[in-house]
């Protein structure tokens, strides 16, 4: 089980990234638009740099919904490999069977 503080920090980052996404997109569009004057694009770059780092979606980590584990998390299930294995061995994941050959 991951530390509660790590899980909460990631949740705060998710919320902050979601709230700041439209503003970041507007600023990035201004920066990428070559028809705008250089001063306006540079001002947009400075505004983007002033925004909190945690407002970037890149800072959000995929975590397991059950354990909070940050590594080996399957995006489709939002579960770590360990959690899937545990649930699968208990027969709680439909269609998941232990392989044998």
Swiss-Prot record:
Pfam families: Ribosomal_S14 (PF00253). InterPro entries: Ribosomal_uS14, Ribosomal_uS14_bac/plastid. GO terms for molecular function: rRNA binding; structural constituent of ribosome. GO terms for biological process: translation. Keywords: Ribonucleoprotein, Ribosomal protein, RNA-binding, rRNA-binding. The keyword RNA-binding applies. Residues 1-25 are annotated as: Disordered. It comes from the Bacteria. Part of the 30S ribosomal subunit. Contacts proteins S3 and S10. HAMAP family: Ribosomal_uS14_1. Belongs to the universal ribosomal protein uS14 family. Binds 16S rRNA, required for the assembly of 30S particles and may also be responsible for determining the conformation of the 16S rRNA at the A site. This is Small ribosomal subunit protein uS14. It comes from Rhodopseudomonas palustris (strain BisA53). The lineage of its organism: Bacteria, Pseudomonadati, Pseudomonadota, Alphaproteobacteria, Hyphomicrobiales.
